[in-house]
């Protein structure tokens, strides 16, 4: 399953607020479609599927990518669900979004893909790059790159920058001072349900 490129509000009407996907709010609270307003009791599978879809659409990744992250999270020590969220939060496109360099995760991915972002002084155009403590994320030192980031910083997608990201707005750079804290994950998600969804699939 490839990355979703369709109407974003249609997704948020079905799954709820996804700050990484869009900053627009859905006007109608019921799901899209002819029978969107009908209330049906959902199965446990449907609930797990919905949590999985929240994660996939918020971070803008394909099903195949998410499966890889689940496998990697499972191989690490500690809670698989927490490990999964940390892996997604540490993606370079998400870090740029959390810093305010991009309006959404797709917008931040474009910044990265177009070579506007550096990691430890080197241009890094891989959105899935795993940032780690000690890395310095910065906007490339040219006029076009700086203008893009400065415009986005005036109206950031999220109000608060996580404390482990030490942002210097004047230099358009940030140092990752510590590991990602589960408490600062922006999306409302039950990661345990996501792990349960993949328990028999991966």
UniProtKB/Swiss-Prot annotation:
Region (Disordered): 1-43
Stated family: Belongs to the universal ribosomal protein uS4 family.
Biased composition (Basic residues): 1-13
GO terms of biological process kind: ribosomal small subunit biogenesis; translation
Signal peptide: none
Species of provenance: Prochlorococcus marinus (strain NATL2A)
A UniProt-annotated Pfam family: S4
Keywords in alphabetical order: Ribonucleoprotein, Ribosomal protein, RNA-binding, rRNA-binding
An MF annotation (GO) of this entry: structural constituent of ribosome
Matching InterPro entries: Ribosomal_uS4 (IPR022801), Ribosomal_uS4_bac-type (IPR005709), Ribosomal_uS4_CS (IPR018079), Ribosomal_uS4_N (IPR001912), S4_RNA-bd (IPR002942), S4_RNA-bd_sf (IPR036986)
Function text: One of the primary rRNA binding proteins, it binds directly to 16S rRNA where it nucleates assembly of the body of the 30S subunit.
Keyword Cell membrane belongs to the record: no
Subunit relationships: Part of the 30S ribosomal subunit. Contacts protein S5. The interaction surface between S4 and S5 is involved in control of translational fidelity.
Record's protein name: Small ribosomal subunit protein uS4
GO cellular component annotations of the record: small ribosomal subunit
Covalent S-S links between cysteines: none
S4 RNA-binding domain: residues covered: 90-152
